[in-house]
């Protein structure tokens, strides 16, 4: 069914010298992660990483969440346990690469 989606983003830097937030919006995706017919949108993906783990963590996590969520082997809607496994896998990558200084990512994704 055709529909129109308009998305906006805004950010408040606060007291830090730079904004560490990272947002990723992919609209109108097929399960392959590729754009679909512009009139139809089976999946819209919104990811927000608030930077509390540091900018490097936010920049690392956002595209990886996109890749894991849009994996061709996934069946939607994703089950809570599967989403938890995705977050655990990315967290283990962060720790393994020495990027994460803490055990949390502070990211949300919606599809």
Curated annotation (Swiss-Prot):
The organism's place on the tree of life at top rank: Viruses
Name of the protein described by the UniProt record: Uncharacterized protein R306
Pfam family, one: PP2C
Keyword Coiled coil: yes
Coiled coil (UniProt feature): 3-29
Entry annotated with the keyword Protein biosynthesis: no
PPM-type phosphatase domain residues: 6-111
Keywords assigned: Coiled coil
PROSITE patterns: PPM_2
Transmembrane segments: none
Organism: Acanthamoeba polyphaga mimivirus (APMV)
SUPFAM superfamilies: PP2C-like (SSF81606)
